[in-house]
Amino acid sequence: MASYHVSHDSYQSPGPSPLYQPIIEAPPPPYPPTRTRYQDYYGGYGQPHPPPLRPYRSDHEYYGDGEYVGCFPFLRSCLTTLCCCWFVEQCCFRSRY
């Protein structure tokens, strides 16, 4: 097997390919710039800004210390009505039976 040595000095980069047209630059952005996303009223509800993002507030922030006891802490965090109804019957109204 003969190994061929290519001299880097004599290597010429190929010209532009005839298959592809030269890339046209993107047109400049419109001036004046377009409105930002929330510049007009947000979502059609008459809010000048999007509603602030807040994490879920703690139960302490809503209820303070010891306002609700018994089954209410469970009911506050209950996700489904079925779960709440079962717990109310089993826990809160146990004294009726």
Curated annotation (Swiss-Prot):
Tissue: Mostly expressed in siliques and, to a lower extent, in stems, roots, leaves and flowers.
Subcellular location: Cell membrane
Transmembrane region(s): 68-88
Span of the signal peptide: none
A cellular component annotation (GO) from this entry: plasma membrane
Lipid bilayer topology: Single-pass membrane protein
Pro residues composition bias: residue spans: 15-27
Gene Ontology molecular function, alphabetical: protein homodimerization activity
Keywords for this protein: Cell membrane, Membrane, Transmembrane, Transmembrane helix
Region Disordered: start-end pairs: 1-27
Description of what induces expression: Induced by salt, heat and drought.
UniProt KW Acetylation keyword: no
UniProt function note: Involved in resistance to abiotic stress.
Family: Belongs to the CYSTM1 family.
UniProt subunit comment: Homodimer and heterodimers. Interacts with CYSTM3, CYSTM4, CYSTM5, CYSTM6, CYSTM10, WIH1/CYSTM13 and CYSTM11. Binds weakly to CYSTM1, CYSTM2 and CYSTM12.
Name by which UniProt lists this protein: Protein CYSTEINE-RICH TRANSMEMBRANE MODULE 7
Species the sequence originates in: Arabidopsis thaliana (Mouse-ear cress)
Lineage summary: Eukaryota, Viridiplantae, Streptophyta, Embryophyta, Tracheophyta
